[in-house]
Amino acid sequence: MKLIAFIAFLLILITIINAQGSIGSSSQSLSSEVDSSDISSSGSNSTASSEGSVSSSSNSGSQSTSNSGSEASGSSNSGSQSTSNSGSEASGSSNSGSQSSTDSSNSGSQGSTGSSNSGSQSSTDSSNSGSQSSTDSSNSGSQGSTGSSNSGSESSGSSNSGSEGSTGSSNSGSESSSGSSNSGSESSSGSSNSGSESSSGSSNSGSESSSGSSNSGSESSSGSSNSGSESSSGSSNSGSESSSGSSNSGSESSGSSNSGSESSSDSGSSSDGKTTCISFHDTLSINTVDDDEIECTGKGETRCISDNNYKCATKQRHGSIECSVNGYIRCTGSNIKCKIGNTECSIRNSRLDITEKPIFTRGPRHH
């Protein structure tokens, strides 16, 4: 009997213990439900201090106030570094891998200030496509310290397409220190285009220019220089060298010079009866000796062309004309018109007019 009572007591204890275990497990499940409802990690919509962002709002794993993997302090899109877009490094806004410290930088450009686009490097203003520029806009891989630089150009002004320049605009590989430089040109000031080098003014396509505009490989210190010309002032075109004025196509000139010519001065007339003109090749001098006389001298072959070679014609019957083949022509009269090479000389009331310039000469003749 005692054994039966003891077994019954054990069964009651086991029942009580089982009942307490079920109550504890139910309470634990309730507490776990409460804990899981409290924690709730959503992993979406996080502004500031989110993963991959330095400060401000960041989208898609970017670092900085930037978008898509960019590192920057301003706003940045698509993997850019800086206040930049698409992989660019900048403090302003930079697009597509550009590096820029201020303003906007696009597409891989590197720049400290301004906008930089597509891999350009720029310190100020805008830099586009891989250009390097310190100020202004730089486009497409240009390197520049100031101004705008495009496509790999270096420029301090504006530089386009691989140009190098410190100021102004530089395009396509040009180098420019000031002004604009285009396409590989080097320019210190002004504009430089396409590989030109220019210190001031504009330089285009590989030209070198210190001032003014220089185009296509020209070198110019001032004025405009085009296509490989060298010019210190004025405009120089196509491989010309010029110290002042305009120079075209390989010419050296202090005034204006065209097509490979060398000239210190062009034509000039005065009312006092003394006028001197120096041509491009044969250094032709045309002087008004007195009120009714013209004297033409040249170091090369000088021709007076009308109906026949070595012949001059007067509009009136009076007056005397001398023509020789050794480079000396003398015309006297009040109304005389003669051609020397492609130069037409006329004297009317002691005034000399030059309408055309000689193109070439065959050299001096000896007798």
Curated annotation (Swiss-Prot):
Keyword Repeat: yes
Top-rank taxon: Eukaryota
A GO MF label: phosphatidylcholine binding
Compositionally biased intervals (Low complexity): 24-273
Intervals holding Sequence repeats: 147-156, 157-167, 168-178, 179-189, 190-200, 201-211, 212-222, 223-233, 234-244, 245-254, 255-265
Region feature (Disordered): 24-274
Cellular localisation: Cytoplasm
Name of the protein this chain belongs to: Protein rtoA
Record bears the keyword Disulfide bond: no
GO biological process: culmination involved in sorocarp development; endosomal lumen acidification; exocytosis; hyperosmotic response; intracellular calcium ion homeostasis; membrane fusion; regulation of cell differentiation; regulation of cellular pH
Stretches the record annotates as 11 X 11 AA tandem repeats of G-S(2)-N-S-G-S-E-S(3): 147
This protein's encoding gene: rtoA
